[in-house]
Amino acid sequence: QTQMMAMVLGNQVAAKGASVRVLLCDAAATLAVQGASFPTFEPAGRTPQDLLRGLMQKGATVEVCAIFLPNTEYESSDLLDGVGVAKPGPIADHMMKPGVRYFTF
């Protein structure tokens, strides 16, 4: 439910014209893995990954944590098209920008 609600809110913010950047870590990073299985949530009848894809179609930047791939069985080729691997330096630079808001789930 946490991942689904995060994606619902991300899509709502993007629909209102805001720029959205998503950093997926730990179990949430599996949202970015092709072929991963997720529960379907009502009332939309969709999965968190479905909403992540929609968020990406709205222009969101989506990245997995730098430590996700080296510490799992996954490789970059397993990620959804358009998902990147975050580099700590650029993420820190982005976090320091005035006006950047954080929502953590």
Give the label of every model feature segment:
Residues F103-T104:
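Aromatic- and Gly/Pro-rich donor/ligand-binding loops
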Residues V20-D26, E63-A66:
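Short internal beta-strands
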Residues Q3-A18:
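Histidine-anchored nucleotide/phosphate-binding helix
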